[in-house]
Swiss-Prot record:
Functional description taken from the UniProt entry: Catalyzes the attachment of proline to tRNA(Pro) in a two-step reaction: proline is first activated by ATP to form Pro-AMP and then transferred to the acceptor end of tRNA(Pro).
One GO CC term on file: aminoacyl-tRNA synthetase multienzyme complex
Source organism (scientific name): Methanosarcina barkeri (strain Fusaro / DSM 804)
Gene3D superfamilies: Anticodon-binding domain (3.40.50.800), Bira Bifunctional Protein, Domain 2 (3.30.930.10), C-terminal domain of ProRS (3.30.110.30)
Database matches in CDD domains: ProRS_anticodon_zinc, ProRS_core_arch_euk
Compartment(s): Cytoplasm
Documented EC number(s): 6.1.1.15
Subunit record text: Homodimer.
Enzyme class, UniProt record, top EC level: ligase
Domain-related comment: Consists of three domains: the N-terminal catalytic domain, the anticodon-binding domain and the C-terminal extension.
SUPFAM superfamilies named among the record's database cross-references: C-terminal domain of ProRS, Class II aaRS ABD-related, Class II aaRS and biotin synthetases
Name of the protein: Proline--tRNA ligase
A GO MF term: proline-tRNA ligase activity
Amino acid sequence: MAESEKEAALPPKEEFSEWYNELLWMAEIMDVRYPVKGLYVWYPFGFAIRRNTYNIIREILDNSGHQEALFPLLIPENEFMKEAEHIKGFEDEVYWVTHGGRDTLDIPLALRPTSETAIYPMYKMWVRSHADFPIKIYQIVNTFRYETKHTRPLIRLREITSFKEAHTVHATWEDAEAQVKEAIGLYTEIYRRLGVPVLRSRRPDWDKFPGADYTDALDAIMPDGRTLQIGTAHHLGDNFAKTFDIKYETPDGEQRYAYQTCYGISERSIAATISIHGDDKGLVLPPEIAPVQVVIIPIIFKKGAEEVLAACKDVKERLTKAGIRVEIDASDLRPGAKYYKWEMKGVPLRLEIGPRDLQNNVAVAVRRDTGEKEQISLPEIEAGVSSKFEAIHENLYQKAKVELENRIFECTELEEVKNKIQDGVATIPWCGKRECGRAMEDVIGAGILGIPLEQKRDRKEKCPICGEETETRVYVARTY
């Protein structure tokens, strides 16, 4: 980018759509100019955010008994079409490969929209005995969906570049149920590491994953009040096992169908993180995923310039040895331009070191999240920086948590819901009947997210459609 472009004004965050689109470009996360709708290019800086985010995901999954594997992108049509209910949910979104060179293929090949039909034929061959369970395998791959709605980088794409999908196999329905609960817990932990509070709910039957017994999901509330689905976990029952003939032998020698789950998370995790934490100056990144965690700005005058630069290099070397990602900006840009650049990129901590700081044996630390300035003793720079990182992360999470809680509105009337969902998420009593839920959605003009997983059922209220008493409330929201 030209220097004039780098210092162009970012729209205020209250104009969220414009802010988001400009931020992706100005902070060098994604370039949207690729000549195919819904396909985008990761800049190196954005890809580093992705890599650091997915390092967290891999760590948490690996530490909970999951194993990473890799399955093919292409799925034969005859395998893809086996699960009728599942396919109904995806058939309008599938990309098909029909030719190899100039030859028409005997069997068309689907570009995976999701991988159940690629993985489960292999599970049929792998699963033999109850001793094999649980099988907990995941992969991180690109998937393709022919989106006809308005596409948006990281949020609604035709190529999902970073789809983490886990597929597990179990002996009983109850074991699979426990796995869904574990998955939701793992996802909550991932988002805690990203400083993102979540809503957790069970989707209504008409919005569950095609072919599943039920779906639990995580949503974030975005700055414009809409919710973004950022994780799902599906109990598949034995539905896919029957379709793909996945059986195991019990201790008594009996052959039974297995029970399965699958759960996914994508680059929407990054969309939520940058949207919730960012501000009018640009990105505000949690230290753990920031490509540059500390930027050192030498404050140089003619006298003492060499000593200042030497001190900056020493600090960088020490912090790097401590596992911290550091850059020194010794460019010819004026200090204000340097601050602008690194604030836009969301660097969590800026260290300023000048001649007077050297005399006092300190660096001036400036936090990106609050703008607070504080001196850190140079002999204790490693511990001082690490302490700042912990404080920054906790502040980002607590601030976002308060914002989320302030955007959840308890309602009893549908007209009230219509008003409140302009700013966030409403809750409303629901009897649980499909016809009442659908009627509510029609009146409100928005969807039921689901029943909160941690809901307290301590009072009876009336369903606004049929008047039946219920202890259940549901989340209602505008969604992406």
